[in-house]
Amino acid sequence: AADTLGALLIHVSTDYVFNGTATKPYTESESLAPLGAYGASKLEGEKSAAKARRHLIVRTAWVFSEYGNNFLKTMLRVGAERDELKVVADQIGTPTYAGDLAAALLLMAEKSVPTGIYHFSGGLPCSWWEFAEAIFRCAQQEGIVSVPPKLTPITTDEYPTPAKRPQYSVLDNSKLQSALGTHTADWSLAIPLVLKKLGLQQA
């Protein structure tokens, strides 16, 4: 359909297409080996999108925002209910603010970057436990949380999930940065923005 209209197809994919055994950030040319059905379905989506003459496949990871269900909102919700939270500390990735991703997608279309696969994620890598620490630290500074819960680091084996996550899924953003001539936004700077927007929604 996109080819019939002469349109650009933008497909958002995920870090789940990798198996997580790397020791350095994944580039777009790394071999793909999804760990489960979810990752395999995302890889099939990439293959379908790549059939379009003009396509951009953008892999991202650990997306959070003031909307929908995501890690930041879950932490705030369960943190208000419990004195202690156990958070996985041996999975490493790069949180990505949905607003930054949306802005990057618009810029990619405006600048007519070459067809292909790109990575976009939110800057410095961290564990889920470190991400949670940053969320509650900021929430306390913003006056949203008076006493944050105790955060206890645990292993992946102690917290199984239906869709198996890659242990290490840090994405190398350099190809897209070069194409756009910009640097990736820092996910930690987006946390206070999201908290403020959540406060306005609840007001």
Predicted regions and their residues:
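Amphipathic terminal alpha-helices
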Residues: 187-203
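NAD(P)-dependent short-chain dehydrogenase/reductase
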Residues: 50-100, 106-107
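Mid/C-terminal beta-alpha module of Rossmann-like enzyme folds, strongest
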Residues: 111-162
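Catalytic helix-loop patch of NAD(P)-dependent Rossmann-fold dehydrogenases
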Residues: 4, 8, 17-58, 62-63
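Residue-level signal for the nucleotide or nucleotide-sugar donor/cofactor binding architecture
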Residues: 36, 93-96, 126, 171, ...
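Substrate-binding strand-loop-helix patch
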Residues: 66-67, 91-100, 120-138, 193
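A hydrophobic C-terminal alpha-helical subdomain
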Residues: 157-179, 184
